[in-house]
């Protein structure tokens, strides 16, 4: 009986070990399933944003600013929103990647199409804008000065900042496991991002609305 007991104890131990290994593999697979789509999106965005200016077409850049854009005052404090939205994107894209497969596939397919549209626009319809002369010495103006140094006035139409922020709202629609308050908060943050792009003179109204339109259109056809 003692031998039988040892045998069954050993058997149970082996089964538990195999079960744990199986669970571990399943967890790793789930983590990869969530992480890979956002990582691919980040890489594609880098190719689009930094690759488009390398293609020289000789097309003169258009300035799409209007008198309405000049109504919005320059507000360097919005640099907090402009830089902070990267955290917003990471959080929401991971939340969306954790949804059901059909929803996740539709979202990242739409995002893929949208980035390609941006690439085509950046190459064949280049735009630029006029930035203000920065004279302040406060921390916010200093941050905007840094932004202007690392981000030249190219790749403006449509606005990727606005497009990605609106995608963060689109991707949470009809997600019953995401609280309604967070969906509403995401919409508020997205609107603040829109305002920040205008207040910092990074974009004009046409860029903002085109970014939203591209996100909505690609979502509908995906």
Labelled PLM ranges:
Residues 16-88, 144:
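N-terminal transmembrane-helix/juxtamembrane module of multi-pass inner/ER membrane proteins
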Residues 46-47, 115-121, 188-199:
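Aromatic-anchored segments of alpha-helical transmembrane domains
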Residues 153-157, 192-218:
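Interfacial helix-loop-helix junctions of multi-pass membrane proteins
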């Amino acid at each position: 009986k003692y031998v039988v007991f040892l045998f069954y104890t050993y058997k149970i131990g082996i089964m538990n070990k195999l079960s744990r290994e199986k669970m571990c593999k399943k967890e790793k697979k789930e983590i990869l399933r969530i992480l890979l789509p956002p990582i691919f999106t980040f890489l594609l965005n880098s190719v689009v944003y930094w690759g488009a200016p390398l293609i020289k077409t000789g097309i003169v850049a258009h300035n799409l600013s209007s008198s309405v854009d000049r109504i919005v005052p320059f507000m360097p404090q919005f640099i907090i929103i402009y830089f902070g939205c990267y955290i917003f994107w990471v959080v929401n894209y991971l939340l969306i990647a954790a949804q059901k497969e059909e929803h996740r596939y539709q979202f990242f397919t739409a995002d893929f199409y949208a980035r390609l549209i941006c690439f085509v626009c950046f190459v064949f319809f280049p735009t630029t804008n006029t930035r203000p002369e920065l004279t302040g010495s406060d921390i916010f103006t200093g941050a905007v000065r840094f932004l202007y140094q690392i981000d030249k006035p190219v790749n403006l139409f449509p606005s990727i900042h606005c497009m990605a922020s609106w995608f963060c709202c689109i991707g949470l629609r009809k997600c019953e496991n995401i609280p309604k308050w967070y969906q509403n908060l995401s919409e508020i943050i997205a609107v603040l991002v829109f305002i920040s792009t205008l207040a910092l003179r990074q974009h004009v109204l046409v860029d903002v609305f085109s970014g939203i339109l591209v996100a909505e259109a690609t979502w509908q056809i995906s």
